[in-house]
Regions:
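A general structural signal for short secondary-structure junctions and capping/turn motifs
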Residues: 23-24, 113, 179-184
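Glutamate identity and glutamate-enriched acidic tracts
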Residues: 19-21, 43, 48, 87-90, ...
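Conserved DEDDh/DEDDy metal-dependent 3′-5′ exonuclease domain
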Residues: 2-81, 239-252, 260-293, 300-303
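Phenylalanine-focused residue identity feature
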Residues: 11-14, 24, 32, 40, ...
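Non-catalytic terminal regions of proteins
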Residues: 203, 209-341
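Acidic two-metal-ion nuclease catalytic site recognized across multiple nuclease folds
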Residues: 128-263
Length: 341
């Protein structure tokens, strides 16, 4: 952007958000996909919608799903690191920035970092994966919502989880905990056991010892962030990677069945997770959090949604009066700021 573009814009910020929300609702239900959007674009959009008295979770509710092109690219590299040509950084790791990937694979990228052009680049980069590693693409399209991730996890004895650490895309062979205790007791993310570890070592540990072991790295309990579009693949992929390739299929199956069959152990893991989460909450000071930063601290009650819709439909004078109808003080403050601006 430049000064001219900003000063001659057709919309105010309030009007722009209204147009975005209207367009997204018209497209819905849809899969909202970008490149590195889960941790950047989506977060920015959610916070702006939240401050704008709109639905912050529009892109992953009411039948909508999310996926991230970067997640798909990383998973594709974990399966086959020759899927695309890449640059390498000073640490020798593959560079997965959109512009770099496009340029290295013969895609014109001189207009990169323009929003519309980046969307076009994302399409072209992902088309290569769609054509050359379709199983990864199809797997990604099956985990675009929390419900899909949970259903997949419940129905599979074990599977390959793709994670990205310190510039490396890795595959982990995991089995979800017993279904009653599969979700984190606080955050509701899927919890799975890493089959590189022998589960019997942990079965009889007292709770305090179990918590100590769970805090060590590498972790034997892996968190699958169900609402962040993880890419989950068939167990064959991780079983061919180290360290799982050194184990027999029978050994891995035995470990998976031991986890699924030990309801008591899974219950104690769940209890340990709850206590660890509470300990972190107790040591965290949230007294200085601003209303804008509180989006994940306290969700807006559903009964406020019709009030927000009515507020947007009202004229500016009536908007001031309607602020008294909100029970959530954050919404009152946001409304005052919108009127002032």
């Amino acid at each position: 952007s430049n000064v001219s573009m900003l000063t001659k814009a057709n919309y105010s910020h309030y009007q722009m958000l209204q147009e975005i929300e209207t367009t997204f609702k018209r497209w819905s239900p849809a899969v909202f996909l970008g490149y590195s959007n889960i941790n950047f674009d989506d977060e920015m959009l959610r916070k702006e919608f939240f401050k704008g008295l709109r639905q912050p979770y529009l892109t992953n509710t009411n039948g909508n799903k999310r996926q991230d092109g970067l997640n798909i690219v990383r998973a594709a590299f974990a399966v086959n690191d020759k899927i695309m040509k890449t640059e390498t950084n000073e640490k020798g790791n593959a560079v997965m920035k959109l512009e770099s990937l496009a340029r290295m694979n013969g895609i014109e990228s001189s207009g990169a970092h323009n929003a519309l052009f980046d969307a076009h680049l994302t399409k072209l980069v992902l088309e290569k994966i769609y054509k050359e590693q379709n199983i990864t693409w199809r797997s990604a399209m099956m985990t675009g919502s929390r419900e899909e991730v949970e259903n997949f996890s419940r129905n599979e004895l074990m599977f390959s989880l793709n994670e990205y650490f310190y510039g490396k895309s890795k595959l982990y062979l995991v089995t979800p905990l017993y279904h009653e205790h599969m979700l984190h007791p606080i955050y509701k993310w899927v919890q799975a056991f890493d089959l590189r570890f022998d589960p019997e070592i942990y079965f009889d540990l007292p709770l305090d010892e179990l918590k100590k072991e769970m805090k060590k790295t590498p972790k034997f309990i892996r968190t699958i962030r169900s609402n962040k579009a993880p890419v989950l693949l068939h167990s064959d992929y991780a079983s061919k990677a180290e360290p799982y390739s050194a184990m027999t299929k029978e050994q891995l199956l035995k470990r998976a069945k031991l986890i699924k069959g030990n309801k008591d152990f899974c219950a104690r893991v769940s209890l340990a997770l709850a206590e660890i989460a509470q300990e972190k909450r107790d040591t965290g000071d949230q007294s200085d959090i601003t209303p804008e930063e509180s989006i994940y601290v306290k969700f807006v009650d559903n009964k406020e949604t019709p009030k927000m819709e009515k507020w947007h439909q009202a004229g500016w004078e009536d908007k001031i009066k309607l602020l008294d109808k909100f029970e959530d003080e954050r919404l009152v403050e946001f409304g005052k700021k919108i009127i002032y601006q």
